[in-house]
């Protein structure tokens, strides 16, 4: 039945095509006749002009009118010719549309054969013009796959249904694809490859179509255009959507299986998957959105850390995205499919960070370099690179003390450390911060072991976030560091250390002992009061109340490393223990390490100070920390969360002490003045 209806439809289409071709031929003849008339008119006008020229030179002025008089019939003839050519054009485009309606041809590979078939074209139109017109119509039709644009009434969209009814059989034949790909003609680019596969599968029916026609020129057109019709119908069909969904699900499933074990490889693959989904489906299909939604779910399941990292990335990019889930980041926050693509980029970012963290525990140097290269902030990356060796040393110590089992916990700790900056930015993440604090307390002992690497990464990512956010809460850490050297200038040399914070942190430690003695003299307390008061207010306003709690606990955990950087970040405690009055902070700044250990908010720091230096810090770092303990303003501890990264520089501290000591002394003089 389907065959007979198809055959009847084909006959109708052929008859319509013949009619259109006849009209086209008639229009061509008319155009030829009009052109001949124009030639005759031109000759006549030329003859008249010649006669008038020969008659006398006086009538020459009237030559223009005379030439224009014949020009008026000529102009009319030219207008008629243009009209005829336009009608011819429309007829040809109708013919092409008819062919495409019957065969689903979506672009013009067969346009030239059809022209050739219709004979030589004396018209001024070029093949390119005809093809372009036909193609625009066809593209319109392709963009509206449900109905054919401009299809003549004689060829209703029944052929579609017939074709669809007839094709399911061939469509299930997988092997028929490759052989007739030339006959198919290229599938229009916007259509994804699964549809192409469908169209190729539908090709066998096309062969039968040619036979039924009994050959001839028209069958050539049929075969040339056939496959692309299947592209059109397949593109809209539920079969194609199901197929795309299958493909995507298979890919995601494979990657899920492969990747849940090793995160970095999985992350790389997943990045590929997401992009493939977008390119293949074009981002307009609900399936595509669903798949992309599923991808983040996979991410979520594979690594809880990655989820935190995604939220951190979302907050870094400053987009007000619901932070409950990566999908919230992607689709809700970015607002649409293009936004989803942006979200894909964001996921890539955060996944790279996850990779870096995972690899960072395994290979500290690699992590340092990758973070240097890939971290959005090139400058911070450079700083990170400077401290890679310290990272390696600290991380190895951390790994030894913590063991592999605790590596993951430091990983979470890192995320929590990163989340603490995020907490400052977004009070909403306070829950995460609370969790991170909880896990931080659990990890307290291990973190004390691993606090230095954690602090390192915290500092690195703290810098990343601080500079990325541009928030003064985040910058609170670095602004306090920056502003204290800038405003205080006790640490004139510290401005340079901030340029190379990681290497110079050790130097600062060295110089801190000297400087902090002087600072305790009262200059540091005074200027810490100033900086703490100002930046403390800023950070209090900006929500470092939350951050202060989280970072206070982090300080407690990272106590000694925190002290290491306390010099540059005495103000930071100002904001963060700002639950404490600034006066208390100043007192603490003046107090020796005993005060630091006895601090109420830093009460946790006391055990951590005792524990941390022993397991983790190298012999060099330990004396530095102990020296700094008294010298550093205990109030600065919250910031040094990031400091531990730079403390590890064991060899640097001695040189740094020498270098930064005198520098800071001079700077302190400047600051005193």
UniProtKB/Swiss-Prot annotation:
Span list, region Disordered: 49-78, 99-213, 295-343, 356-673
Membrane topology annotation: Lipid-anchor
One Pfam family per UniProt: Paralemmin
Description of what induces expression: Up-regulated by bacterial lipopolysaccharides (LPS).
Organism: Homo sapiens
Annotated coiled-coil segments of the chain: 4-49, 75-101
Ranges of biased composition (kind: Basic and acidic residues): 392-477, 487-532
Modified positions (Phosphoserine) in chain numbering: 124, 143, 155, 157, 260, 325, 375, 420, 544, 660
PANTHER family linked: PARALEMMIN-3
Protein name: Paralemmin-3
A single Gene Ontology CC term: plasma membrane
Protein purpose: ATP-binding protein, which may act as a adapter in the Toll-like receptor (TLR) signaling.
Residue ranges, compositional bias (Polar residues): 123-137
Transferase listed as a keyword: no
Residue numbers of Cysteine methyl ester PTMs: 670
Source domain of life: Eukaryota
């Amino acid at each position: 039945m389907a065959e007979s209806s198809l055959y009847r439809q084909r006959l109708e289409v052929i008859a319509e095509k013949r009619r259109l071709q006849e009209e086209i031929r008639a229009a061509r003849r008319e155009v030829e006749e009009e052109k001949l008339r124009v030639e005759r008119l031109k000759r006549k006008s030329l003859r008249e002009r010649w006669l008038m020229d020969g008659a006398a030179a006086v009538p020459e002025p009237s030559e223009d009118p005379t030439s224009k008089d014949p020009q008026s019939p000529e102009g009319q003839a030219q207008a008629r010719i243009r009209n005829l050519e336009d009608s011819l054009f429309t007829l040809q485009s109708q013919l092409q549309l008819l062919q495409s309606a019957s065969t689903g041809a979506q672009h013009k590979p067969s346009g030239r054969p059809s022209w050739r078939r219709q004979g030589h074209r004396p018209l001024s139109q070029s093949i390119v013009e005809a093809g372009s017109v036909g193609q625009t119509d066809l593209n319109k039709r392709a963009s509206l796959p449900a109905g054919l644009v401009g299809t003549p009434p004689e060829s209703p969209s029944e052929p579609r249904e017939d074709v669809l009814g007839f094709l399911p059989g061939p469509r299930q034949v997988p092997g028929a694809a490759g052989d007739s790909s030339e006959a198919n003609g290229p599938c229009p680019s916007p259509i994804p490859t699964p549809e192409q596969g469908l169209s190729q599968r539908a090709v066998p029916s096309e062969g039968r179509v040619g036979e039924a026609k009994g050959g001839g020129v028209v069958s050539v057109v049929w075969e040339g255009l056939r496959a692309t019709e299947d592209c059109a119908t397949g593109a809209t069909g539920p079969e194609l959507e199901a197929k795309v969904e299958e493909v995507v699900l298979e890919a995601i499933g494979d990657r899920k299986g492969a990747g849940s074990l090793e995160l970095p490889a999985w992350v790389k693959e997943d990045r590929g998957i997401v992009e493939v989904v977008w390119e293949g489906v074009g981002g307009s299909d609900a399936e595509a959105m669903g798949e992309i939604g599923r991808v983040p779910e996979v991410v979520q399941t594979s690594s809880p850390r990655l989820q935190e990292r995604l939220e951190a990335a979302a907050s870094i990019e400053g987009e007000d995205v619901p932070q409950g889930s990566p999908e919230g980041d992607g689709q809700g926050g970015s607002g649409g499919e293009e936004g989803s693509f942006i979200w894909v980029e964001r996921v890539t970012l955060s996944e790279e960070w996850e990779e870096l963290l995972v690899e960072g525990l395994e290979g500290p140097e690699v992590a340092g370099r990758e973070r240097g290269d890939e971290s959005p902030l090139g400058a911070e990356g450079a700083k990170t690179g400077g401290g890679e060796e310290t990272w390696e040393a600290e991380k190895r110590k951390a790994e030894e003390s913590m063991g592999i089992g605790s590596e993951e916990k430091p990983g979470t700790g890192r995320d929590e450390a990163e989340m603490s900056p995020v907490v400052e930015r977004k009070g909403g993440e306070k829950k995460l911060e609370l969790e991170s604090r909880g896990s931080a307390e659990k990890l307290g002992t291990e973190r004390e072991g691993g606090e230095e690497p954690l602090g390192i990464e915290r500092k690195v990512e703290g810098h990343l976030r601080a500079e990325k956010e541009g928030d003064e809460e985040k910058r609170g850490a670095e602004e306090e560091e920056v502003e204290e050297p800038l405003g205080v200038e006790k640490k004139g040399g510290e401005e340079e250390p901030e340029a190379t914070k990681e290497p110079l942190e050790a130097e600062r430690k060295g110089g801190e002992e000297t400087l902090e003695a002087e600072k305790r003299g009262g200059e540091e307390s005074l200027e810490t009061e100033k900086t703490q008061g100002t930046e403390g207010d800023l950070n209090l306003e900006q929500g470092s109340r939350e951050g202060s709690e989280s970072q206070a606990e982090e300080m407690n955990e990272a106590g000694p490393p925190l002290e290491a950087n306390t010099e540059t970040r005495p103000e930071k405690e100002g904001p963060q223990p700002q639950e404490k009055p600034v006066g208390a902070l100043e007192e603490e700044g003046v107090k020796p390490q005993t005060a630091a250990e006895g601090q109420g908010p830093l009460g946790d720091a006391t055990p951590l100070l005792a524990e941390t230096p022993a397991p983790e810090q190298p012999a060099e770092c330990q004396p530095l920390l102990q020296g700094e303990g008294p010298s550093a303003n205990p109030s600065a501890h919250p910031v040094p969360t990031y400091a531990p990264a730079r403390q590890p520089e064991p060899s640097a501290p001695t040189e740094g002490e020498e270098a930064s000591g005198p520098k800071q002394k001079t700077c302190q003089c400047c600051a005193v003045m």
